[in-house]
C-alpha cells in the first residue's frame, strides 16, 4: 500500500512540476544566471506547491542548473542540462533533460524528464507569437507520461523597458486520451525581471493558480 501511495505522489508531483509558465527555446546566454521561483495554490483545499530553478549559461546555446519541487508530503531535487537554438524569428528549438531525486527517500532516483521547447513569431513585428512545450517523463516503477502544451501570446510594449504579455493555450496528453485543459495568464516585464500570474483547471471545483517571478543576471 505504501508503494502505491508513493507512486501516486510521484506521478502527481511530476505533472505539477511540468505545469509551469511556458518555456522558450533559447538559453540564458554565456556567463549569465537565470532564476525562477513560483508558488502554486488551489483555493479551498490545502494543496500548496513550489518550484524553483537556477540555470547558468555555458556558451550561447548550452545551460546547466538545478531545480527543486515541493508539494504536499513530497520534495524532489533535480539536475538539468539545456540546449537552445535560435534558428530565425519564426521558429526556435530547445531541449532539456532533468534527472530528479526524492529527498524524502534518501535521494533515491524518481524520474527523468525530457522536454522539447519551440517558439516563434506569428506577426512580422514579433508581438504575436506561438509557443509549444512537449514533456516526456520516465518514472521509476510506474507508467511514463507524455504531454504537450501549446500557447499563443501577444506582447504589449510599455514605457521604460516594460511590457505585459497575456497568453492562452491548451494542456493535453500526447495521445489526447484525457480531457484537454485550458491554461491562461500573463507576465509583466520590468527590464530583466518577469512577474507571472498563471492558472489552469478553471472548470474544476478547485482551479490552480500560479504566481511566479524570474530574472536574468
Question: What is the meaning of each model-derived region?
Answer:
Residues 4-13:
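Sec-dependent N-terminal signal peptides
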Residues 17-42:
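Outer-membrane beta-barrel biogenesis signature
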Residues 33-39, 48-52, 75-79, 112-116, ...:
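Hydrophobic, lipid-facing positions within transmembrane beta-strands of outer-membrane proteins
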Residues 33-34, 60-66, 88-93, 123-131, ...:
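Repeated loop/turn-to-beta-strand initiation elements of outer-membrane beta-barrel proteins
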Residues 37-43, 66-70, 95-101, 116, ...:
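Transmembrane beta-barrel strands of outer-membrane/channel proteins
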Residues 45-92:
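Glycine- and aromatic-enriched membrane insertion/assembly motifs of diderm outer-membrane
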Residues 106-171:
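Detector for outer-membrane/organellar transmembrane beta-barrel domains
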Residues 184, 188-191, 205-217:
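Outer-membrane beta-barrel "beta-signal"
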Amino acid at each position: 500500500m505504501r508503494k502505491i501511495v508513493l507512486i501516486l505522489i510521484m506521478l502527481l508531483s511530476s505533472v505539477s512540476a511540468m505545469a509551469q509558465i511556458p518555456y522558450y527555446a533559447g538559453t540564458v546566454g554565456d556567463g549569465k544566471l537565470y532564476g525562477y521561483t513560483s508558488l502554486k495554490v488551489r483555493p479551498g483545499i490545502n494543496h500548496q506547491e513550489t518550484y524553483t530553478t537556477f540555470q547558468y549559461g555555458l556558451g550561447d546555446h548550452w545551460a546547466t542548473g538545478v531545480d527543486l519541487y515541493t508539494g504536499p508530503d513530497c520534495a524532489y531535487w533535480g539536475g538539468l542540462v539545456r540546449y537552445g537554438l535560435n534558428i530565425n524569428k519564426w521558429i526556435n528549438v530547445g531541449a532539456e533533460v532533468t534527472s530528479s531525486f526524492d529527498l524524502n527517500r534518501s535521494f533515491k532516483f524518481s524520474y527523468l524528464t525530457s522536454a522539447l521547447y519551440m517558439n516563434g513569431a506569428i506577426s512580422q513585428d514579433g508581438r504575436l507569437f506561438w509557443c509549444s512545450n512537449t514533456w516526456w517523463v520516465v518514472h521509476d516503477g510506474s507508467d511514463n507520461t507524455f504531454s504537450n502544451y501549446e500557447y499563443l501570446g501577444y506582447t504589449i510594449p510599455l514605457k521604460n523597458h516594460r511590457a505585459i504579455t497575456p497568453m492562452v493555450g491548451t494542456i493535453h496528453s500526447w495521445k489526447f486520451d484525457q480531457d484537454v485543459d485550458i491554461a491562461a495568464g500573463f507576465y509583466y516585464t520590468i527590464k530583466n525581471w518577469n512577474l507571472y500570474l498563471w492558472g489552469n483547471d478553471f472548470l474544476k471545483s478547485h482551479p490552480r493558480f500560479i504566481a511566479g517571478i524570474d530574472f536574468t543576471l
